[in-house]
A protein has these predicted regions:
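Detector for C-terminal structural segments
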Residues: 350-378, 417-424, 449-561
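Ligand-site clamp/hinge motif
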Residues: 235, 263-308
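Append "and occasionally in soluble cytosolic enzymes with long acidic Gly/Pro-rich linkers
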Residues: 339-427, 432, 512
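Gly/Pro-rich hinge or "lid" segments in bacterial periplasmic/extracellular proteins
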Residues: 199-200, 204, 212-271, 275
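N-terminal lobe/hinge region of extracytoplasmic solute-binding protein
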Residues: 72-122, 153, 242
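Ligand/substrate-recognition segments at binding pockets and active sites
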Residues: 254, 399-464, 503, 531
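Aromatic- and charge-enriched surface segment that lines or borders ligand/interaction sites
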Residues: 116-164
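Surface-exposed binding/hinge segments that line
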Residues: 166-224
Length: 561
């Protein structure tokens, strides 16, 4: 039986390798394809790329073989605009080229990236970063503290298109959305060439600010500050990304792969290998690629659950299941007239989360009812996961739910686990009389539909956070996909918790937040998913425990051929 399964995967890989390449396209205007077609083409294209890279034919026998790492992700990135990331797929691309001040580890601690160290003042109103030395931009320009200052001025400019402005909301001189209150008012100043000071509006828990700053990519602000908002919004401005990161952008085939060269002058230690290729590979094809060596690891989404047992049996792979904050959630479009609080509660309690975890995840996860899971120090054990079909039916009837209506249920393609979860949820809802039509689109199209409010329901994943206040990102601003009223009770509780400076003060407030989150149900939180990590044994120095916080540190990996 095992041989048949192995043969099936190898046949899949061979079939994929025979598919032709698609042409490169403009990063902003190319037509998106279905994830399965994209990944099949990507597998073919990058198969030859990886093979050629790993076996680099050389005319001179003394020339060293080029070392290449090929990493996969199951979804397509949006574009190369680092201030407007829409998904973790975008983050995977940007994270190679650009750096942030700090990075979050899986255990909740922070490590410096551009920052060598940091210190908060006694009043917790200022945070001073000392910067590392030897930092250079990929174009050879010297890096300075002023690049950070100008980067944050760009992010806070209301005319600039950015989804990262939200992370500036605690800074002095910015409003609640992170917008500067007047031109250049943001409280970020350089102290010489090697220090930057961040001033807060009021005393703030320092980990909250560090968490936000870990999401902000530093761009070459001193060069970009004089460009207009229109220029900064053009794809050609970012066609050749210039960062300080461990990898230098080389080329891409839109929707299929991005290739990078190692930054041999990287201030945090040059990569051990020469080239990094990030490929879009449908989750159904990931194990085949790992088994035959076409891909070395998966950066987001991990190995599909159905394939993990077989992955663990492969002699060429290292595997690990790691608990994570990452979760899946159901989007309820609160802007729809029928989608009242009572209806949202009913739809949420109609979902059998325990069965989803046991049957779909084979126990590699945990049912949740809020974004705060049991491994989070802020977890409230008194807020129980619900499942009550009879009560769900009763509440729908009491709310006069339009049972004759078919709800559009948007599902992004490329993640087989999520697609299967959506099908099961549709059956759960059918059991309480709710009709759905599943609409499958690629991830960028899904995000566009969700932001416009085209959907009735949607399913999406989040990396989660140990910091409860990050939940506000999905309740206000660009990522308020549920379209809930902005000034809601949940936001008020999060702000209250944020205003407190000790764990002892904050915990009761975030306990109440979880109670209210279940009651208001703007989203139907479903389950956490363990990170099912697999990587080729030729790699060492990989830290699976940090994958859930998107801190891959690829430049620290070692490669043996």
């Amino acid at each position: 039986m095992k041989k048949k399964v192995l043969a099936a995967f190898l046949m899949a890989a061979m079939t994929i390798s025979m598919v032709g390449c698609s042409k490169p396209a403009d990063t902003k205007t190319s037509e998106t394809k279905s994830a399965s077609k994209t990944s099949a083409s990507a597998t073919s294209t990058a198969s030859s790329t990886a093979s050629a890279s790993k076996t680099s034919s050389v005319a001179n026998t003394e020339q060293a073989v080029e070392k290449t790492v090929v990493a996969a992700m199951p979804g397509k990135w949006s574009d190369l605009y680092p201030m407007g990331e829409d998904s973790h797929y975008d983050n995977i691309i940007f994270d190679q080229v650009y750096d942030s001040l700090v990075k979050l580890n899986g255990d909740g601690s922070y490590q410096g990236e551009i920052a060598e160290s940091w210190e908060v003042n006694k009043e917790s109103t200022e945070l001073t970063f000392k910067l590392r030395s030897g930092i250079k931009w990929h174009n050879g320009d010297e890096f300075s503290a002023n690049d950070i200052v100008e980067s944050f001025k760009i992010y806070s400019n209301p005319d600039i298109k950015t989804t990262s402005r939200y992370y500036l909301r605690y800074l002095d001189g910015c409003d609640e959305g992170g917008v500067e209150t007047k031109k250049g008012s943001i409280g970020v100043t350089a102290k010489g060439d090697n220090e930057v000071v961040f001033k807060f509006k009021k005393p703030t828990f320092v980990d909250t600010v560090l968490d936000d700053l870990s999401h902000v990519y530093i761009v070459e602000g001193t060069k970009l500050k004089d460009k207009s908002a229109e220029e900064l919004g053009k794809a050609e401005t970012w066609a050749k990304p210039n960062g300080t990161g461990a990898f230098i952008y080389d080329s891409m085939v839109d929707g299929e792969r991005v290739e990078f060269k190692a930054n041999k002058e990287y201030y945090n230690g040059a990569p051990d290998f020469d080239k990094l290729v990030i490929r879009v590979v449908d989750s159904a094809n990931i194990l085949a690629g790992l088994m035959n060596g076409e891909i070395d690891t998966v950066l987001y989404g991990g190995v599909p659950l159905d394939d993990f047992k077989l992955a663990k049996e492969q002699e060429n792979l290292v595997t690990e299941s790691v608990k994570s904050q990452g979760y899946q959630l159901l989007i309820f479009n609160c802007a729809k007239k029928y989608m009242s609080e009572k209806v949202r509660q009913a739809l949420s309690m109609a979902i059998d989360r325990k069965s989803l975890v046991e049957q779909l995840l084979q126990g590699e996860g945990e049912p949740i009812i809020t974004p705060i899971s049991s491994i989070n120090p802020y977890y409230n054990p008194d807020v129980k996961v619900w499942y009550d079909v009879n009560q769900a039916k009763k509440q729908l009837e009491e709310a006069k739910f339009p049972f004759d209506k078919t709800l559009k249920f948007y599902v992004p393609t490329g993640n087989s686990m999520r697609e299967k979860a959506a099908a099961i949820i549709a059956e759960n809802l059918k059991a309480v009389g709710v009709k759905t039509e599943i609409v499958q689109v690629d991830f960028p199209a899904f995000m566009e539909a969700a932001k416009k409010g085209d959907e009735d329901l949607g399913i999406v994943g989040s990396g989660g956070s140990l910091n409860p206040s990050e939940s506000s990102e999905m309740l206000t601003g660009a990522f308020n996909l549920c379209k809930i009223e902005e000034n809601n009770k949940l936001i008020k509780l999060l702000k209250k918790g944020d205003s407190l400076l000790t764990m002892e003060e904050r915990k009761p407030v975030f306990d109440e937040f979880q109670v209210e989150m279940k009651k208001i149900s703007p989203y139907g939180y479903l389950f956490t998913t363990n990170s099912l990590v697999a990587y080729n044994k030729r790699l060492s120095g990989v830290k699976p425990e940090n994958f859930s916080t998107f801190n891959w540190e690829i430049h620290t990996w070692k490669v043996s051929e």
